[in-house]
Amino acid sequence: MKEVKSIIAGVVATGKVGDYILYQRLGVPCIRRASTKKRSADSYTETQRIGQSRLRYLVSLYQALQPTVVKRAWQRARKRPGQTGFNAFVSQNYAAFGKDEVIADYSRIKMSEGDLRLPLGIAVAVTGPRELMLSWDIRKDKLLGEATDCLYVLLMDGDGSFRTVVKEETGVCRGDGRAIVALAPGEGLPEHLYCFWASANGCRFTPSWYARIAWQ
């Protein structure tokens, strides 16, 4: 049994999704492996059905991101005793999904969590037909971290498919102050950008930062 810290005020999300069951124990949301017993779909409440749908799509999103640095970020995130990176990802991203089984608010998706701080003044601008520039303040009192912290950028489509391009080898550090993000030939124009920084040894992370891209 794994505990999941809920961030949904007034919503009790329970039900079976794939190999997992989301349930409440002493008021604490938990996840455990599902048993082989069958349960009639008619026996679920509407709240449980919504919880099932959200968890199903959260699992799909996590699986899509597993091959990337996002998995390591959540493994390193501060968690409750016994909580896995997957549990932490679910609890922090549950509220981003709506009743219609899609991401309702992309700004509430968290691609990383950690104890490092984001630099101040982060901004994104469209600088070409297929190019973005990400910038941030590098003055000493604004940098809020080591100049050697590595930048990671994620670009996500807005069609609910979870198609995400992860720029893991940006070669850009916190001390550089800006990064040019060029789309590869054949890549569609993403609607959503997430970025975060990791320490040079890859053991500590910042929370992720989000922006919607306004292509011209």
Predicted regions and their residues:
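Long, polar/Ser/Thr-enriched low-complexity segments
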Residues: 1-120
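Charged linear interaction tracts used for macromolecular binding and regulation
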Residues: 77-216
